[in-house]
Amino acid sequence: PIILAPMAGVTDYPFRILCKEMGAGIVYSEFVSADGIIRENSKTLNLIRFEEPERPIGIQIFGSDPEVMSQASKYVFEAFKPNILDINYGCPVPKVTKKGGGSAALQDLCLMDDITAAVVESVPEIPVTVKMRAGWNNDSIVIPGVGQRLENIGVKAITLHPRTTKQRYTGDANWDYIKPVSYTHLRAHETK
């Protein structure tokens, strides 16, 4: 299926409906702060509200504290019942990464594991997915090893933005990062 990626300031209700009408099989909300969710911030909650015709739909959250991410995940599931919960490890924007959110997790893989495990354990009813970048910079590419780590924790799918955090949205995407992740994943399933 065609999957609409979560994009801040883009994937709002009208855009999601338009994409559904044009054939998108799965759509995602804009990414939202786990802190905003547990504080029940009305602006944050309005970003993730959706209507039944949008299903299947994923809600994407970000944060840097495993307990807060767990609480936010439970809240989202209980209040909204999305089909998928997605963790953002891909946002390169400094106002997010300075607080440890988004792609900042690529600098502390143990924390990434803890956050991911907390989310997976808090919503066993639905699949948890991850959107991430290839690494923090060209000297710290974490793909493909992180893909296997996340799968072992219980992540059901990974969306890879084949750029680094430092590249932000400029420069060439390195499509060579994707092939080893796909190949590693396929080989692991062949041997099971």
Predicted region positions:
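Glycine-rich, positively charged N-terminal anion/phosphate-binding segment
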Residues: 7-83
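Alpha/beta enzyme core
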Residues: 74-85, 94, 99, 111-167, ...
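Short glycine-enriched, charge-decorated loop/helix-capping segments at active-site entrances
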Residues: 100-106
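Short, well-ordered coil/turn segments that N-cap beta-strands
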Residues: 1, 24-25, 52-57, 81-83, ...
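N-terminal small/glycine-rich loop or linker at the start of catalytic domains
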Residues: 1, 38-41, 46-56, 91, ...
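Active-site beta-loop-alpha junctions enriched in small/polar residues
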Residues: 7, 32-34, 62-64, 90-92, ...
